[in-house]
Amino acid sequence: MSKEPIIKLDNIDVTFHQKKREINAVKDVTIHINQGDIYGIVGYSGAGKSTLVRVINLLQEPSAGKITIDNQVIYDNKVTLTSTQLREQRREIGMIFQHFNLMSQLTAEQNVAFALKHSGLSKEAKAAKVAKLLELVGLSDRAQNYPSQLSGGQKQRVAIARALANDPKILISDESTSALDPKTTKQILALLQDLNKKLGLTIVLITHEMQIVKDIANRVAVMQNGKLIEEGSVLDIFSHPRESLTQDFIKIATGIDEAMLKIEQQEVVKNLPVGSKLVQLKYAGHSTDEPLLNQIYKEFEVTANILYGNIEILDGIPVGEMVVILSGDEEKLRQACQAITDSQVQLTLLKEGGKA
């Protein structure tokens, strides 16, 4: 994957003026997105994430900052392109939304063809391109269907085909799966991931769900109240989240919070005996946790009772999380915990035996 940024947003501010007050929707945000990235921007409603991505193609003009797209500066405290140049630049960037915005009176192929209206292609070339795009998104057999005859997932596939009609280098997905059921969401995310690989497409995902980022992104930014509060590779953010909001997003995405509620109700945890510790283990890159637990038993005679375990594959790397009860002699238990930490596994003490 190329390390050359295709999108550079530097010190972006967006301020709205409403009556006698100012709303600072985006505050001094800098984000660089590399060619070929699937880059997630996560935040709750009102975080400023949708406003931020709309500055990428100047659908929203910032109040200050610099925007560079594919090595071309398009904004430097003012728009640097003519209206014609800006139209050409916007052809390089496709967008899909939560609402599909299809024209109900047009068939699937006609909706896609509409995006080629000013392409200069012949009628035959347009038809061939539309057919290719519908095949790309898995809808060749639905070309003659109207939107009312399509499911939500199929409508979004038409919207994706339309967004790709002018061969953009960048695709912005603004909450594009929010209106879809979980199964269809996974299918659309798999399609986006496939397009990223086949076309070398750079994808910017706007979402309030860390689960979506976890499934397909390689980098993520977290926004809160217009500010960028955390940014990095998905692996780093999931392994070592710094900010409390990021930690909350990750707990929801991994299901650990729900698991902990059940674990805390177990009798063995409520009445944890002296000589036992309830610990949470997190690791990245280890193919399995079993050798480590076997090792501490062999070396320190410390047993491990696994109460919860989960492994995710993030950007091709396994990331694991476990909740276990470690039991043994006090000194051996201390040594075992140190050995676990020394093996690059993050250990968090949740409860100590004999204590409330």
From Swiss-Prot:
Subcellular location as annotated: Cell membrane
UniProt KW Membrane keyword: yes
Binding site for ATP: G43, Y44, S45, G46, A47, G48, K49, S50
Keywords: Amino-acid transport, ATP-binding, Cell membrane, Membrane, Nucleotide-binding, Translocase, Transport
Record domain ABC transporter: where: 7-250
Keyword Oxidoreductase attached: no
GO CC term, one of those recorded: plasma membrane
Transmembrane spans: none
InterPro entries: AAA+_ATPase, ABC_transporter-like_ATP-bd, ABC_transporter-like_CS, ACT-like_dom_sf, MetN_ABC, MetN_ABC_transporter-like, NIL_domain, P-loop_NTPase
EC number: 7.4.2.11
Catalytic activity: L-methionine(out) + ATP + H2O = L-methionine(in) + ADP + phosphate + H(+); D-methionine(out) + ATP + H2O = D-methionine(in) + ADP + phosphate + H(+)
Pfam families xref list: ABC_tran, NIL
Membrane topology: Peripheral membrane protein
GO molecular-function terms, A-Z: ABC-type D-methionine transporter activity; ATP binding; ATP hydrolysis activity
Function: Part of the ABC transporter complex MetNIQ involved in methionine import. Responsible for energy coupling to the transport system.
Similarity-based family: Belongs to the ABC transporter superfamily. Methionine importer (TC 3.A.1.24) family.
Subunit structure: The complex is composed of two ATP-binding proteins (MetN), two transmembrane proteins (MetI) and a solute-binding protein (MetQ).
Protein's recorded name: Methionine import ATP-binding protein MetN
Gene designation: metN
